[in-house]
């Protein structure tokens, strides 16, 4: 397999404290930072209520047997408008006016101040659509499986105590889940009537090509099926899921600030009169009255028409940005929470493309000038219809083409190629063989058997994650945040019952009146920043330790283990992040670690866990020691070995065997039955 050269990332961000891009000892800077902090708080308040109101609106549609429409930027814009105090400007017409009225009818919240936030809220609207659609596209099939599991666990809750019954039940309901997702009927006959009754409540009856394809094309038609499953789980009093994302965290979140947002927030017509004269070159004259013919005063509104020409001057007025990135230019956009900020850089290869987009957008706006609202709406609707038709045409053209499997798509340019996907010449040299895990993040060994373990305890100590958690918990307990948040535990944010969700919203918004001012304390954002810095430093230290133990010239062969879902009662641990960090310094190749943990590297027989009794344990029960494996030695005596060392030795064995023969050892292949 020949590796293709990766195209450059379009954007790159540089994260740093916002204080590092501010002019020093400047009173205006302090005033502007106060404006920015208030804008962040106001934006968070608006978006929190918008999520709540949108979810409530969707539930009203469902319970009134109305079709749940596609959620667009217009939908979110009207939802936000219903939450904000009235502002001057053109009133919504047509479909937008109907949407606004719908939201106002169900809105019971206090109104928020949305002045000078239009650009920031536009970005948030896009973020919200992404969050809503991703929740459907990426989690729907997991929710279907969870629903089927919960339903039949409840149905057979008495018999499920029997291990054999439980094993057989899971085997049978796996077929039921596959039948629902693939629209087949291969499960046991006893499930047919249930499937016939519930299938099209769980998934749509009409779909295009397959459910996996259809959900990518039309995600919103799956919302009602998610609500149905939630309501059924509520009836059974089983754990539900969140069919619609909401914003519950009261810590100030990041906002995106571009040139337009900068002008909206910081430029004042009177205060910056001289600057406006410099920035705005076009002269406008008064066309009537006694001052006819005299130059018009330049305003903040005039500046919006020439942002592109003046963006560098505008940013230099308010921020001291001197940071650079090789082959990248500053994109005049920052993402900030008021303490930390990310400067966005655009790759030089994409500058022309982005400029063309802006010119096209500007030309489109110019073409709409002077048209009535109805004419503008018709043009927009025609454009949407044309895009839909073109997308449908493309789908039909691609329908007959042979489809690549996900595996084939990945193989074309994998992030971490497997050892059998690259020429053997690329694997020649010195090797570090790594067995990834939870307790020991990386257990590694070189060709000579030199062993090193990078543990989760080392990672936690260096990142200070537990220390910051404890400090914040103590602080929250002391100022009363914990007590208020515990009071919300009696409400269910996942409920699909309108009355109960309305109760939750009312309680949460009331709690936020106290929580939001408390969470504005910089300490919360500070520790978030410190965690980020420590994480980056820890990753660098990890690589330095590996280089010191071995060398930069080694090739890494790493097991393809991944946890999939977070284990209960075990702290979350990094895997892919650290793997990518290794790739910055080393060549990294995956190896299929099938059976490398359960077979003894010496005898190739199945290992068992060691069980021991502890003197301090009064019950004298034998306890499993997960980190130690036992195996039968050749002299029929029992031997012990560290699980991680055994894994590394097995990976070495499989790798060396592959280099010699191009195959896997027989007992480590999936065809061999143990």
Where are these regions (language model features)?
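Positively charged, helix-rich recognition surfaces that bind polyanionic ligands
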Residues: 2-674
């Amino acid at each position: 397999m020949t590796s293709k050269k990766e195209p450059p990332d379009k954007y790159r961000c540089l994260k740093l404290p916002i204080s590092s891009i501010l002019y020093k000892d400047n009173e205006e800077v302090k005033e502007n930072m106060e404006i920015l902090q208030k804008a962040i708080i106001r934006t968070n308040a608006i978006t929190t209520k918008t999520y709540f109101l949108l979810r409530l609106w969707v539930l009203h549609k469902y319970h009134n047997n109305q079709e749940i429409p596609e959620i667009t930027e217009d939908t979110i814009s009207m939802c936000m408008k219903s939450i904000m105090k009235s502002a001057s400007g053109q009133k919504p017409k047509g479909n937008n006016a109907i949407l606004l009225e719908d939201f106002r009818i169900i809105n019971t919240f206090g109104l928020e101040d949305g002045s000078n936030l239009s650009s920031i809220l536009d970005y948030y609207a896009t973020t919200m659509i992404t969050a809503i659609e991703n929740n459907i596209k990426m989690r729907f099939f997991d929710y279907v499986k969870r629903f089927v599991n919960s339903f039949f666990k409840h149905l057979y809750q008495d018999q499920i105590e029997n291990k054999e019954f439980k094993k057989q039940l899971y085997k049978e309901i796996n077929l039921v889940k596959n039948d629902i997702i693939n629209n087949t009927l291969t499960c046991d006959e006893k499930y047919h009537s249930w499937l016939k009754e519930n299938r099209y409540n769980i998934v749509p009856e009409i779909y295009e090509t397959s459910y996996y394809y259809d959900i990518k094309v039309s995600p919103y038609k799956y919302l009602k099926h998610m609500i149905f499953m939630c309501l059924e789980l509520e009836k059974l009093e089983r754990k539900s899921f969140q069919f619609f994302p909401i914003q519950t965290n009261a810590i100030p979140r990041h906002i995106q600030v571009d040139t337009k947002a900068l002008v909206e927030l910081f430029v004042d017509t009177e205060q910056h009169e001289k600057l406006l004269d410099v920035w705005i070159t076009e002269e406008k004259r008064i066309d009537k009255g006694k001052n006819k013919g005299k130059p018009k005063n330049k305003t903040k509104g005039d500046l919006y028409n020439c942002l592109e020409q003046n963006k560098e001057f505008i940013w230099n007025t308010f921020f001291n940005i001197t940071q650079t990135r090789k082959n990248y230019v500053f994109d005049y956009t920052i993402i900030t929470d008021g303490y930390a900020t990310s400067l966005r850089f655009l790759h030089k290869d994409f500058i022309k493309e982005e400029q063309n987009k802006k010119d096209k957008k500007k030309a489109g706006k110019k073409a709409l000038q002077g048209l009535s609202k109805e004419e503008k709406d018709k043009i927009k609707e025609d454009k949407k219809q044309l895009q839909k038709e073109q997308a449908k045409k493309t789908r039909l053209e691609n329908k007959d083409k042979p489809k690549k499997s996900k595996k084939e798509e990945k193989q074309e340019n994998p992030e971490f190629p497997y050892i059998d996907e690259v020429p053997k010449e690329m694997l020649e040299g010195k090797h570090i063989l790594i067995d990834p895990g939870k307790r020991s993040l990386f257990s590694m060994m070189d060709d000579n058997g030199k062993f090193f373990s990078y543990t989760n305890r080392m990672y936690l100590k260096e990142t200070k994650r537990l220390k910051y958690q404890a400090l914040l918990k103590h602080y929250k307990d002391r100022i009363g945040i914990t007590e208020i948040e515990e009071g919300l535990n009696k409400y269910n944010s996942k409920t699909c019952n309108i009355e109960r969700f309305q109760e939750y919203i009312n309680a949460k918004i009331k709690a936020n009146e106290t929580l939001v001012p408390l969470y504005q304390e910089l300490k919360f954002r500070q520790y978030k920043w410190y965690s980020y810095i420590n994480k980056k430093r820890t990753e660098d230290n990890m690589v330095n330790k590996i280089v010191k133990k071995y060398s930069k010239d080694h090739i890494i062969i790493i097991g393809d283990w991944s946890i999939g879902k977070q284990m209960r009662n075990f702290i979350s641990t990094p895997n892919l992040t650290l793997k990518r960090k290794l790739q910055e310094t080393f060549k990294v190749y995956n190896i299929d670690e099938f059976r490398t943990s359960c077979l003894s590297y010496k005898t190739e027989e199945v290992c068992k866990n060691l069980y021991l009794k502890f003197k301090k344990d009064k019950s004298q029960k034998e306890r499993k020691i997960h980190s130690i494996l036992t195996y039968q030695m050749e002299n029929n005596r029992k031997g012990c070995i560290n699980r991680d060392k055994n894994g590394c030795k097995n990976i070495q064995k499989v790798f060396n065997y592959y280099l010699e023969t191009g195959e896997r050892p027989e007992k480590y292949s999936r065809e061999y039955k143990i």
